[in-house]
Amino acid sequence: MARRKAQVAGQHSPASARLTNPTAGAPAVGRWLIFRYEPTTLFSLKMSRATSSVGRTLLIPTQYAAKMAFVDAAFKVDWRGEIAALVAALASVDVRIGVPERAVVTHTIIKIRQEPKDRKSGPAYIPAVAYREFVYLSGSLRWAFDLATAPEWLAAALIEIAPAINYIGKRGSFVQFVGYGREFELGPAFTQPLDGVELKPTSGMQIAVLDDFGPEASFEALNSFSPVPIRRDRHRVFRETLVPLGLVNVGPGFSEYSQEPG
């Protein structure tokens, strides 16, 4: 992400102003503003506990990855608002991820080059092998933003930025913007944070730890090129989340997940 400040054009509502009418700010009606993306390549997003040699992947993007995709795309479209205000607004918004109909994970061993433990002598990089997982997603990904928790100006900003998003996380997990819409309620195909609620996943669900913007998230802290350190529970939080994808089939080198039938 280029480290620069976007110029301000016009006046935006302050981040503290909440949407008094959850159906305002975007065409159609409904509390949830939902963006739909079609995966065009294999998806991979390492779990928070993954190591460089064992790269297990999540099945879906996290809220953090979705929000960072909007921040990155804001630079691409030369968005005329303040990036700092966008990050602060996204930090306050509840986001749910709509899962695809099916996900197939391939388990692979690949050759990589990594820095040696002794960096003072020898080559800068040495050959090694690593475990990697990649996901084939059958169906669209949907990102639902709760407008009742958003500043009034955010809906229009997201709609302007959304078409410029073409990858998730690190470059490689490419997606194609399909469109957006509004819904009053979300269906069972969307993630649900546990937040202390005792829910037992059924055969068509699983619990995963997904990250999100923290309450004090700022562009300076989240920017990879900034010297400001990112702090857990302040700038970035991790939440146990119910993901409506359950294991339905396993075989040599793959695992298949699907939404609960019906």
Regions found by a protein language model. Give the residues of each.
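Conserved active-site/ligand-binding neighborhood in enzyme cores
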Residues: 2-262
